[in-house]
């Protein structure tokens, strides 16, 4: 299939022939959902920890005798019913990661990129550079491409480009090797350079 190719000013620069396997695949919603969910789950720290009644310090002595005080019976001041006591079902560190094999991961990327292309949300440019780390300069380039927010995918991240994009809200910059399903799904539009799309195509074909 062919994708529209633009220059940095947003002017048409011809057509780019790309692999049907990578950019004209059917959209598989269930697969995309599974892979994106797994990706986000893997980003969870899972370090939450609380103490049960047996782990909280103190509470070894019975607060008062069993009968005769008029108070409810109590065996420890670290009961979950008490302020400062342990948690009834205390949270412990856990691993939230889910297994996704390479075939599924690549299939999800193909589905997402193909759907972005079908919806005209994939903007292919010959190259995207800025002469200095100036947000104003990058913003002007993106507006010329009709992009206000989304994701920029380049072959290799340039320091000027990264610094210029850092001050723009809802705009991310990744290299071709760092493209992930969650970032693509969450992007309003994806700006990708010709060299980056060739690397992605090579990996997915």
UniProtKB/Swiss-Prot annotation:
Function, as annotated: One of the primary rRNA binding proteins, this protein initially binds near the 5'-end of the 23S rRNA. It is important during the early stages of 50S assembly. It makes multiple contacts with different domains of the 23S rRNA in the assembled 50S subunit and ribosome.
Annotated source species: Halorhodospira halophila (strain DSM 244 / SL1) (Ectothiorhodospira halophila (strain DSM 244 / SL1))
Keyword Ribosomal protein (UniProt): yes
Gene: rplD
One GO biological process term: translation
Assigned keywords, A-Z: Ribonucleoprotein, Ribosomal protein, RNA-binding, rRNA-binding
Gene Ontology MF annotations: rRNA binding; structural constituent of ribosome
Transmembrane regions listed in the UniProt entry: none
Stored NCBIfam families: rplD_bact
Positions of the UniProt region annotated as Disordered: 43-78
Subunit structure: Part of the 50S ribosomal subunit.
Protein name, UniProt field: Large ribosomal subunit protein uL4
GO CC terms, sorted: ribonucleoprotein complex; ribosome
Similarity section: Belongs to the universal ribosomal protein uL4 family.
């Amino acid at each position: 299939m062919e994708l529209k190719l633009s220059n940095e000013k947003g002017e048409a620069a011809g057509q780019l022939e790309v692999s049907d396997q990578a950019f004209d695949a059917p959209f598989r919603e269930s697969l995309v959902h599974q892979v994106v969910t797994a990706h986000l789950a893997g980003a969870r720290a899972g370090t939450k920890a609380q103490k049960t009644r047996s782990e909280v310090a103190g509470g070894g002595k019975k607060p008062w005798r069993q009968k005769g005080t008029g108070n409810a019976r109590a065996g420890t001041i670290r009961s979950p019913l008490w302020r400062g006591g342990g948690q009834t079902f205390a949270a412990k560190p856990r691993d939230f990661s889910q297994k996704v094999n390479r075939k599924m991961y690549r299939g999800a990327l193909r589905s997402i990129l193909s759907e972005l292309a079908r919806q005209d949300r994939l903007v292919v440019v010959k190259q995207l550079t800025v002469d200095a780390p100036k947000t104003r300069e990058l913003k002007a380039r993106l507006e010329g491409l009709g992009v206000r927010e989304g994701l920029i995918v380049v072959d290799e991240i340039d320091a000027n480009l990264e610094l210029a994009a850092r001050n723009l809200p809802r705009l991310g910059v990744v290299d071709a090797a760092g493209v992930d399903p969650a970032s693509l799904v969450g992007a309003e539009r994806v700006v990708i350079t010709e060299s980056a799309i060739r690397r992605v195509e090579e990996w997915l074909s």
